[in-house]
Amino acid sequence: MVLVFSDDKKLTLEMLSKGSELAKKLDKKLTAVVIGKSDDALAKEYIAHGADKVFIAETDIESFKAEEYTELLENVIKETGAETVLIGSNKNGKELAPRLAGRLNTGCVTDCMDLYLKDKKLTTERIVYSGNAIAVEQFNSKPQIATIPSKVFDPLPRDDKHTGEVVKKKFDVEKSASKILKIQEMKSEGVNVEDAEIIVSCGRGFKNKDDIKLVDNLAEILKGRTIGCSRPISADLKWLSEDHWIGLSGHKVKPKLYIAAGIS
């Protein structure tokens, strides 16, 4: 069985596309996991986008805690007998996947840009050395766990004729030793670079914050435009918020047009 999980619906839909391809080649079923309250509408959507089964792990967990989610997913994997596990590489997934691999004493490849079968083995490709090389790796243990960033694969077209099974099971997990005291939403400028079709991006080549107006002026000329930036502009200089941050450690984008100014 190929199992897919992310707490990000859009990322799950993207992973279901690659998961469906792998499941067919492995002659296995594709299962999407939902954690929390039963959500029949979400289950139906996942099935329409390629899932053969949706496993709803019902639990009273109110918010993400890595320890609790790790135990819960470990139980789901053992329950389903999944041999291939795809986890969304967002902030929660990056913490969850290695913990899960440790609990299951198995391998984990992170931020995969492609997955395929070679010599009957699951093979992964990921970017290393700041984008200067691609590492090609194979698993020698099961279950095999891989994380996938957003915007790597396109979701399958919705097919409401595709049928699937919905399984619901309640789980009790050991309460985490840590306690969430407060959740504070980060201030957002309402910028969504991940869905932008046209992006004008600036980097360290800009000497002054006021120079970013040049990028803003160009962006205004282009309809449907969004301003992006590299890590130094957001993380170091704080000239733009993290909403604009694009790159390996920032947002993953797939626009129709990308203009990079002052970025090496």
Predicted stretch roles:
Residues 1-264:
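N-terminal glycine-rich FAD/FM-binding segment characteristic of electron-transfer flavoproteins
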